[in-house]
UniProtKB/Swiss-Prot annotation:
Expressed in leaves, stems and flowers. This is Probable 3-deoxy-D-manno-octulosonic acid transferase, mitochondrial. Keywords: Glycosyltransferase, Lipid A biosynthesis, Lipid biosynthesis, Lipid metabolism, Mitochondrion, Transferase, Transit peptide. The keyword Transit peptide applies. Pathway: Glycolipid biosynthesis; KDO(2)-lipid A biosynthesis; KDO(2)-lipid A from CMP-3-deoxy-D-manno-octulosonate and lipid IV(A): step 1/4; Glycolipid biosynthesis; KDO(2)-lipid A biosynthesis; KDO(2)-lipid A from CMP-3-deoxy-D-manno-octulosonate and lipid IV(A): step 2/4. It comes from Arabidopsis thaliana (Mouse-ear cress). The record marks E136, K216 as: Transition state stabilizer. It is an enzyme of class 2 (transferase). One of its GO terms (biological process) is Kdo2-lipid A biosynthetic process. One of its GO terms (cellular component) is mitochondrion.
């Protein structure tokens, strides 16, 4: 533990020393549109809102996926303890743009402070949280040590540690530091048994590790604007006479795989349409531009372009926050982030919740536990492929056989409902036991 304290002091001194350079870096990111244009000072702990009186819980999620996983817990907390103030922080602008419309009324949002001593002290000094709930794997030393010093209970929900991160934290230099950091948590809720074992191997106290299920299974009915709902209904009408499949969460390079499969499918299914949903809107615009340059007919969602039957067979989505609704227009969902080595998969449960037949590649990394759990429950709930030809054959089988398609759809929906049941209840019991009734400056009781 002494070595861990020594390594932390080195880290603290380093982050203090490079703070001016970090400040310049954030300003540069702001000019590039990577930080919020007017709210970027929040990254240095400068608040843009007044702290309400009373108890406050801080939920932190770095990006969109983690943020959406936190929302069901935040909603439950807001319902059972309406007099409690909830603060949510995210790091990325894209996460903020989507999540701001999903948070319950009264929940505050700020951009997360950088892990520098001044930013963390400034942030904690203003907001004075009674408990801090961190999503997944944000182990920031200055934040954790400062919170511990103020006797603020810390919880890590949906805790995960990738193989790469585990190897890095296990190094002789960093193991003492991560052991020190994990010892400060009152609750670590891993998203799988394997993840729990990894945290134990990093010397997390066994009594704080409690498995409750993967929050990414809990896909509640999030708020959708009336305009979005209407446009989705219009899209369903346009696609009514076509064979539709959707390829979502695509990383750069994966569109080549999807378009190659689509071109092969057109030979046997000339009335088929593929909906392409890249992770970033700008990537979608680039895909559409390239396809048009090659002479292909493409409809771009942000421009409200219509599909022409037997002519337009590629629909590119270059908008944010609509994926759950878009799954409802396609019976087959191919989940990206899984077709190129080095990628680590994406959430399958959103498509399963919508009743899609789910297909994914073999590079699923962070979501390997989800693929395994779903396939163990019912092998038809997820089809995993390794090559472009296997993907083509899997989609072709479903497009050609309505009965087989319906069986796969029902399997994914049933497995989702089974795996998602009681997760929020279990999480809430753990939070109430380990966090809200734990040792802190101000006792919180949430029933």
């Amino acid at each position: 533990m002494k070595l861990g304290v020594f390594v932390y002091r080195l880290y603290r001194a380093l982050t203090y020393g490079v703070s001016p350079l970090i400040h310049l870096h954030i300003r540069w990111r702001r000019l590039r549109g990577l930080e919020h244009f007017s709210r970027w000072p929040e990254r240095f702990g400068h608040p843009s809102a007044v702290r309400p009186p009373g108890s406050l819980i801080w939920f932190h999620a770095v990006s969109l996926g983690e943020g959406m996983a936190a929302i069901p817990v935040i909603r439950h907390c807001n319902e059972v303890k309406s007099d409690l103030t909830i603060l949510m922080t995210t790091t990325t602008v894209s996460a903020f743009e989507v999540i701001k419309n999903q948070l319950p009324v009264g929940v505050l949002h700020q951009f997360a402070p950088l892990d520098t001593p001044l930013a963390i002290d400034r942030f904690l000094g203003h907001w004075k949280p009674n408990a801090i709930i961190i999503m997944e794997n944000e182990l920031w030393p200055n934040l954790i040590m400062a919170a511990s010093g103020l006797l603020i209970p810390l919880g890590l929900l949906n805790a995960r540690m990738s193989t790469k991160s585990f190897k890095r934290w296990s190094s002789p230099l960093l193991l003492p530091l991560v052991s020190l950091l994990l010892s400060k948590f009152s609750l670590i809720a891993p998203l799988s048994t394997l993840q729990g074992i990894r945290f134990q191997l990093l010397h997390a106290p066994p009594f704080v590790i409690n498995y409750s299920g993967d929050l990414k299974y809990v896909v509640n009915k999030f708020h959708v604007s009336s305009g979005t709902s209407e446009s989705i209904r219009d899209l369903k009408v346009e696609l009514a006479e076509m064979k539709v499949w959707i390829a979502s969460s695509l990383h750069r390079g994966e569109e080549e795989v999807i378009l190659g499969v689509h071109n092969m499918l057109l030979e046997s299914h000339p009335d088929s349409v593929v909906i392409i949903v890249p992770r970033h809107p700008h990537h979608g615009q680039q895909i559409a531009h390239k396809l048009r340059k090659d002479g292909q007919s493409v409809a771009l969602r942000s421009q409200n372009e219509k599909l022409t039957p037997r002519k337009t067979n590629i629909y590119v989505v270059d908008t944010l926050g609509e994926l759950r609704e878009l799954y409802s227009v396609a019976p087959i969902a191919v989940i990206g982030g899984s077709f190129i080595p080095g990628l680590t998969g994406h959430n399958l449960s959103e498509a399963a919740a919508a009743g899609c037949a789910v297909i994914t590649g073999c590079h699923v990394g962070h979501f390997s536990h989800m693929v395994k759990a779903m396939q163990q429950a019912n092998p038809l709930s997820v089809t995993q492929v390794s090559t472009k030809l296997e993907l083509k054959e899997a989609v072709d089988l479903l497009l050609s056989n309505p009965e087989i398609l319906e069986t796969h759809q029902r399997a994914s929906k049933d497995v989702y409902e089974s795996l998602s049941s009681c997760i929020i209840t279990n999480i809430w019991k753990l939070l109430n036991l380990h966090i809200f009734r734990g040792k802190s400056r101000n006792h919180i009781e949430c029933k």
